[in-house]
Amino acid sequence: MRLIIKNSYEDCSKWTADYICNKIIEFKPTKEKPFVLGLPTGSTPLGVYKELIKKHKEGILSFKHVVTFNMDEYVGLEASHPQSYHYFMMDNFFNHIDIEPKNIHILDGMAKDKKKECEDYEKAIRSYGKIHLFLGGIGADGHIAFNEPYSSLTSRTREKTLTRDTIIMNSRFFEGNEDLVPKTALTVGIGTIMDAEEVLIMATGHAKAEAVHQAVEGGVSHVWTVSALQLHPKSIIICDDAATDELKVKTVKYFLDIEKGNIETNVSRK
């Protein structure tokens, strides 16, 4: 596992966007061999999406041969609902880049047969071989996507009941009304994420400090689903200073020292 520590959220966003940009460009994707990218929603990746849009508009990066799979979607919300993750992704990212609509994959929270929808999603991922890079964020309780505490670390895409904490946290997007927050969601599993060639997780702010501590210094446990990253051959957590508040001083020093040669991922393409 790599732990990248930056000064601020803005620095984390720029580093992450540069990293993704480099990966796509180095892959040299084509129609026959697209780059497959896993994506999250929420406030954490917004800065990354803005940076990637900027790179696209500057002619540095094209998404024409990029295929995306989103992590999750609320059950019961139409794609046109302002708080659906379909709407979020179109409004904050896809409408601003040159990605082919057919290459966008987001779970359908209105599917009549949710089990089949989840099984088909797994099949769609497998049809491309694998996800090359899965970007994600984590909750204060260490959940990735909607894999809440005590989720199986080998889980696949399925319907999950949201915890009380998650409903309270997400109510800020629903006029502060917890009753308006969907109680279940379709989500990729921890096993689905772990199958990716590479996993990159963003964690910023003091509220994520305990989750970062458990992910890096704690043992592997389904209580903190993010801890599964310890078993991944190529996982990265990028965080700001505030998110390291619960780490041991020697842990922070270790990662700062070992990453000195890797800390910058500047993109300079014309």
Swiss-Prot record:
The record marks 151, 158, 160-161, 254 as: Part of the allosteric site. Pfam families: Glucosamine_iso. The active site is at residues 72, 141, 143, 148. InterPro entries: Glc/Gal-6P_isomerase, Glucosamine6P_isomerase, Glucosamine6P_isomerase_CS, NagB/RpiA_transferase-like. Its EC number is 3.5.99.6. Disulfide bonds: none annotated. The keyword Metal-binding does not apply. Pathway: Amino-sugar metabolism; N-acetylneuraminate degradation; D-fructose 6-phosphate from N-acetylneuraminate: step 5/5. Catalyzes the reversible isomerization-deamination of glucosamine 6-phosphate (GlcN6P) to form fructose 6-phosphate (Fru6P) and ammonium ion. PANTHER family: GLUCOSAMINE-6-PHOSPHATE ISOMERASE. This is Glucosamine-6-phosphate deaminase.
